[in-house]
Regions:
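Non-transmembrane, solvent-exposed regions of membrane trafficking/translocation machinery
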Residues: 1-74, 83, 97, 450
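Interfacial segments of transmembrane alpha-helices in multi-pass membrane proteins
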Residues: 36-37, 41-62, 123-124, 128-179, ...
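Juxtamembrane "pre-transmembrane" interface segments
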Residues: 80-84, 92-140, 395-443
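Pore- and gate-forming transmembrane helices of large, multi-pass membrane proteins
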Residues: 121-141, 192, 210-248, 301-302, ...
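Small-residue-enriched core segments of transmembrane alpha-helices in multipass membrane transport
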Residues: 153-175, 186-193, 254-269, 460-481, ...
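Cytosolic juxtamembrane regions of multi-pass inner-membrane proteins
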Residues: 191-232, 278-285, 483-544, 590-600
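Hydrophobic alpha-helical transmembrane segments of membrane transport and translocation systems
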Residues: 206-317, 558-600
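Transmembrane helices with small-residue packing motifs
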Residues: 296-353
Length: 600
């Protein structure tokens, strides 16, 4: 807050104001008038007396945050340390001005809680490589769909093109900033969008195999696939919603694009794909051979091999836990917490050559320690690149600027190749708490939805066990691969939870349909239903996993380091989720459902 003369010179700041309040008085003419009463400090009163004495009849603008908030004219010299500003239209206007003056008079010191500075070249390269990955992955998925599903595959390719266009248009319409996690959300949603088409086409093939006409098969296939599509997408949408409400800025970017992708994928598969399928049929493509026919699969005894599946999972988890223990004994910690969860400053620098760890410790670390006064500087090289990552305590803006200048001067680094991120310990603790709450809330909501939809707590119970299996697998991946654990860790976990539940729901949906038709009374009957349901959905489970995995794999190959750290555990989670949905979830439901039941 500044008090200025007409020529723009500041003669007094907000510290000279002791009090400012709105009031309504009766003036000399007997009319009520709304004013602001100013009470000045002793030093302020002295300065104000001198300036007003020399500026009678002139204006003394009051400026707050570079904006003139009042333009009062001096009627007479003010020497008593109090002043009145008149001319307000109503009391609310007077109160607003008084409030601004009070706020401006406070002695506030801003403390930087979080900052992120990205070099222009790094940002452009990251966005460019991620978008290329999305385009390549999309083309691969389209080719796979055409080869696998013939005419419906061509329809799916067109629907995917329309879907992608709608996503881009929506992002542009709502002016959603495209971040790297946001692009990851788009790429993942493209892979998951294929799932709905795969479910529909599998149902259509089954209807044709049952002897129905193509026209009837198309209509019935869409109708029978609807419940599985809605249930699977709603559970993933729940995860996206929780991420959007509880996550930080970068995670919200991932959540928003994922949510948009899910909503638009449901629209394109249930409306666009259906219209295109009917259009293809209408122009004369009516022979069943163009649509494919479901092959009769001899059900594999998945239920009978439950013990083997559980033993395999337990063996992997035990080996992983041993690796975790060895990792802790050598490094002293289990997880590689990123800045979001522990606070500090991370500076990424693209050097003019690849540096070894010894060179970094000898040439770079001592300089950073000297600048920052931090004796615990951590620096590492990004494998296969010229980039190094320097982690320190939280640095001030001045310290970051000094570090930047030093790197530019001593190593010839271009300023645009330096990226820095700072997070205070306060923010990191809040983010860690929000992350835990987000996972718990999302998981509970998804499981409650399953319970509500399937009217059987055993479905939810078996889903919990399968999800725990997937989460443990991904956790082990983070530990052994020493991947940074931050907000993308939460995004990855919730994505895997949503994906795994989606896979599991498709099989549960088949079991539910079978239970409506066949009133099973024995273990053998339930065993047959479960084995047949898994066999019927096997092609869908495998094909969906392949398309989603391909999208993430391309992202891993072409993405920058931060994206790779998201894609790698995501691929592990996709494999674990596919395995658990096929080999564990339904089998565990069978064990819970038939507990205490006679074999025959």
């Amino acid at each position: 807050l500044e008090f200025q003369t007409e020529d723009g010179k500041t003669f007094m700041d907000g510290s000279a104001v002791a009090q400012a309040k709105a009031a309504t008085i009766t003036n000399d003419t007997g009319n009520k008038e709304n004013i602001v009463e100013l009470t000045l400090t002793d030093e302020g009163a002295k300065t104000f007396a001198e300036v007003t004495s020399a500026n009678v009849g002139k204006a003394l603008p009051i400026v707050y945050d570079d904006e003139v908030i009042s333009y009062p004219t001096v009627q007479q010299a003010i020497t008593g340390g109090t002043a009145q500003i008149s001319g307000m239209a109503n009391y609310e206007e007077a109160e607003s001005l008084a409030s601004q003056i009070r706020i401006g008079s406070l002695s506030l010191k801003l403390e930087e809680m979080r900052s992120e500075v990205v070099g222009a070249q790094l940002g452009e390269e990251a966005i460019s490589s991620s978008l290329k990955a999305a385009a390549i992955g999309l083309v691969i998925v389209m080719i796979f769909m055409i080869v696998q599903y013939l005419v419906p595959g061509v329809v799916a390719a067109f629907a995917l093109a329309i879907y992608t266009t709608l996503v881009i248009a929506t992002l542009y319409l709502f002016e959603i900033t495209l971040t790297l996690p946001g692009i990851a959300g788009i790429i993942l949603s493209i892979g998951m969008a294929v799932d709905a088409n795969v479910i529909i086409f599998a149902r259509i093939r089954e209807e044709i195999a049952d002897g129905k006409s193509v026209a009837t098969a198309i209509e019935t296939g869409f109708a029978r696939a609807r419940s599985a599509i809605l249930d699977g997408n709603i559970t993933t949408l729940i995860a996206a919603a929780v991420l959007g409400l509880r996550g930080s800025g970068t995670v919200k970017g991932f959540a928003s694009t994922l949510a948009i992708g899910i909503i638009l994928s449901m629209f394109t598969c249930m409306v666009v794909t259906k219209v295109l399928m009917h259009a293809v049929y209408a122009i004369g493509v009516r022979d069943a051979k163009f649509y494919g026919k479901a092959k009769e699969r001899k059900p594999f005894d998945f239920v009978g091999k439950t013990g083997i599946f559980i033993a395999i999972s337990c063996a992997i988890i035990v080996c992983g836990c041993v690796g975790v223990g060895m990792h802790k004994s050598s490094d002293g910690t289990i997880l590689n917490y990123s800045l979001e969860f522990k606070g500090g400053t991370s500076t990424a620098v693209v050097m003019d050559k690849q540096y070894s760890i010894k060179e970094i410790d000898k040439e770079i670390v001592p300089l950073v320690e000297k600048i920052t006064g931090d004796g615990n500087v951590q620096a590492q090289a990004v494998e296969g690149t010229k980039q190094i990552i320097i982690k320190t305590r939280t640095l001030s803006l001045e310290e970051r600027t000094k570090l930047e200048k030093t790197m530019t001067k001593n190593f010839g680094v271009d300023k645009k190749d330096i990226t820095s991120e700072s997070i205070s310990s306060t923010v990191s603790n809040e983010m860690k708490t929000d992350a835990i709450v987000a996972v718990v809330i999302a998981t509970i909501c998804m499981l409650l939805y399953i319970w509500f939809r399937f009217k059987d707590v055993r479905f939810a119970g078996s889903a919990v066990i399968a999800l725990s299996h997937d989460v443990i697998m991904v956790f082990i991946c983070y530990v052994l691969a020493w991947i940074s654990v931050g907000n993308t860790f939460i995004a990855c976990m919730l994505t895997i939870i949503g994906y795994s539940i989606n896979n599991t729901i498709v099989i549960f949906d088949r079991i539910r349909d079978a239970l409506k038709k066949h009133h099973a009374q024995t273990k053998a009957a339930y065993k047959e239903i479960v084995n047949k349901s898994i066999a019927q959905t096997m092609s869908r489970s495998v094909n969906t996993s392949i398309t989603t995995f391909v999208m993430v794999l391309v992202l891993y190959i072409m993405g920058v380091t931060s994206i790779r750290e998201f894609a790698l555990p995501l691929m592990v989670g996709l494999l674990a989720g596919t395995y658990s949905s096929i080999c564990l979830a339904s089998e565990i439901w069978y064990l819970l459902r038939t507990k205490g039941m006679k074999k025959e």
